[in-house]
């Protein structure tokens, strides 16, 4: 990575530090209700337990009866049968939450899946299924609950990934990266459109934390391994398969628990000044490559055209964006009214 990108990346990483909300919910916020999809395991479950312990009320979306039963045992949690690909379950969840009379302050669109396949050997049915959960699921949930969120002038938090920024550097992750890039674009546009209603929208971009998405991905790969034959990426996919077999056999992730992600979700939901994006990684390397990728794409866009910026002009633009982010100035595109 060129020296300028490394230096700028280090500066940018510091800008992403969090100021978590206090450990206990403020009295005025206690019992505010939020909906978390995909709350049976991983980031969703961790966040549901943390928010409930701090006095918020959590509607926890889950698909399986045993998960619903387990979630209902947690104080300040009501489990909701909710498959984000099933419109009838979404409609029923809306009616249930409306009937509870608490209103709805926030949505955490957390449900997601990952399927590994190289782009030229992926199956269209897998791509459709992945987008049905990761993209259309976010769209369906947000659209269905938008009236309640507008009424409360609340929050929408979409769980994206560093994969929503990274692309082109990891074989077989293309479909997942496509879906998370879509979530990034959706979040940016939604934030713009909902601002006029007093609703704030954020994306969380977690790195590699312990979650159920990895084990689910591996179990799916193992189950389908006898039927999947690769021509161009056989060695790569065999290596992934062997790694998945070891992972499933051990049953334990070496990644840290998603406490930092839950803190970011809580900040986005309840802080007076939530950020639009929260890059949350367990180590500096994942932050560096994510910020570095953003700079790489910026420099590629700027390369050798009629309106390219010089290095000095790019740094000046970065300083201006930094000032806007800190609230020291407002954006001026230089366009006459």
Each model region followed by its residue ranges:
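Substrate-binding pocket helix/loop in short-chain dehydrogenase/reductase
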Residues: 118-119, 126-128
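Residue(s) in the substrate-gating loop at a strand-loop-helix junction
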Residues: 161
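C-terminal beta-strand-loop-alpha-helix "lid" module of Rossmann-like NAD(P)-dependent dehydrogenases
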Residues: 197-250
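Conserved glycine-rich cofactor-binding loop
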Residues: 40-41
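Rossmann-fold cofactor-recognition segment
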Residues: 75-88
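Active-site helix of classical SDR
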Residues: 142, 179
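Conserved NAD(P)H cofactor-binding loop of Rossmann-fold oxidoreductase domains
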Residues: 110-115
């Amino acid at each position: 990575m060129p020296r300028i990108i490394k230096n700028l990346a280090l500066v940018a990483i510091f800008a992403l530090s969090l100021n978590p909300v206090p450990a206990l919910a403020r009295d005025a916020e206690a019992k505010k209700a939020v909906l978390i999809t995909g709350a049976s395991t991983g980031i969703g479950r961790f966040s549901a337990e943390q928010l409930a312990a701090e006095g918020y009320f959590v509607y926890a979306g889950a698909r399986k009866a045993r998960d619903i039963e387990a979630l209902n045992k947690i104080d300040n949690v009501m489990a909701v049968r909710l498959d984000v690909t099933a419109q009838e379950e979404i409609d029923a969840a809306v009616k249930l939450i409306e009937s509870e009379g608490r209103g709805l302050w926030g949505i955490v669109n957390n449900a997601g899946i990952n399927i590994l396949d190289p782009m030229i050997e992926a199956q269209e049915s897998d791509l459709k299924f992945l987008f049905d959960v990761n993209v259309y699921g976010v769209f369906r949930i947000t659209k269905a609950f938008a009236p309640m969120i507008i009424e409360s002038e609340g929050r929408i938090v979409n769980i994206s990934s560093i994969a929503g920024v990274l692309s082109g550097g990891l074989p077989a992750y293309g479909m997942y990266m496509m879906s998370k890039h879509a979530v990034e674009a959706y979040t940016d546009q939604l934030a713009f459109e909902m601002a006029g209603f007093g609703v704030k929208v954020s994306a969380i971009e977690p790195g590699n934390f312990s979650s159920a998405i990895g084990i689910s991905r591996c179990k799916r790969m193992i189950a389908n391994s006898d039927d999947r034959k690769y021509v161009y990426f056989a060695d790569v996919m065999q290596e992934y398969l062997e790694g998945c077999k070891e992972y499933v056999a051990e049953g334990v992730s070496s990644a840290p628990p998603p406490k930092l992600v839950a803190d970011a979700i809580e900040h986005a939901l309840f802080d007076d000044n939530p950020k639009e994006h929260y890059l949350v990684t367990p180590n500096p390397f994942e932050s560096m490559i994510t910020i570095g990728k953003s700079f790489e794409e910026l420099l590629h866009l700027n390369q050798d055209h009629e309106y390219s910026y010089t290095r000095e002009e790019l740094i000046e633009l970065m300083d201006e964006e930094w000032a806007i982010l800190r609230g020291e100035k407002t954006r001026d595109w230089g366009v006459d009214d």
